[in-house]
A protein has these predicted regions:
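Extracellular glycan-recognition regions
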Residues: 1-202
């Protein structure tokens, strides 16, 4: 399997974007977001998502993001969007001039779970690596594209068969910014099988 922009399909195609063989740019629209129910008690499902489809059970997808975010919750990153109630994403969400949230959201059966850590607001580029091992998934991040750090390991209840994965960008509040995606690559699964305690017998 290889990453081919000609295989990408939009869910909610944005008004402004450019796609070439090695770069994708998205201009976000205000009040676009992905979130389901938890804490905020709203259901937002209108962010543009650009993905390819696969039945491959073991692989990794890497992408570099660059962004001009400037307003609270502006974000772009890697995503696996199955439907409105089952998806996961990894991104940086801008907060203020001091810090932003590097984090991931896992949404299973209509409830979102957000895990974050604060990073400096001056960071305007981040690499992500999305890996699949059957119906388990891992998201990692890197500032240089070489050394990746684990952000999230999760199970997706509806992620065991054919999936869609790719990129997204959105501005949940009254804002707009440009998100740029480059260095998109699919490789063998870089998230290696666990080499410690053996699995329990089913």
């Amino acid at each position: 399997m290889r990453f081919d922009v000609n295989q990408l399909k939009w869910t909610r195609e944005p008004a402004e974007y450019e796609i070439s063989s090695d770069k994708i740019e998205i201009i976000t629209k205000p009040h676009t977001d992905l979130w389901q129910r938890t804490y905020y008690h709203f259901r937002n499902d209108n962010a543009p998502v650009l993905q390819m489809e696969t039945e491959e059970k073991f692989f990794s997808f890497t992408v570099k993001t660059e962004f001009e975010s400037k307003h609270r919750f502006d974000q772009c990153g890697v995503v696996m969007y199955l439907d409105s109630e089952n998806w996961l994403k990894g991104s940086i969400e801008y907060e203020n001039e001091r810090f932003q949230h590097l984090g991931s959201v896992v949404t299973n059966n209509g409830y979102s779970d957000w895990a974050t850590t604060e990073i400096d607001a001056g960071i305007k580029s981040m690499w992500y690596r999305f890996s699949r091992r059957e119906d388990d998934y891992c998201i990692e991040c890197s500032e240089d594209g070489v050394t990746f750090k684990q952000m999230r390991i999760c199970h997706m209840w509806n992620g065991g068969e054919t999936i869609q994965f790719g990129i997204y960008a959105c501005s949940p509040e009254d804002s707009s910014f440009k998100a740029t995606f480059t260095n998109m690559e699919i490789t063998e699964c870089r998230w290696l099988a666990h080499d410690g305690q053996q699995p329990d017998e089913e």
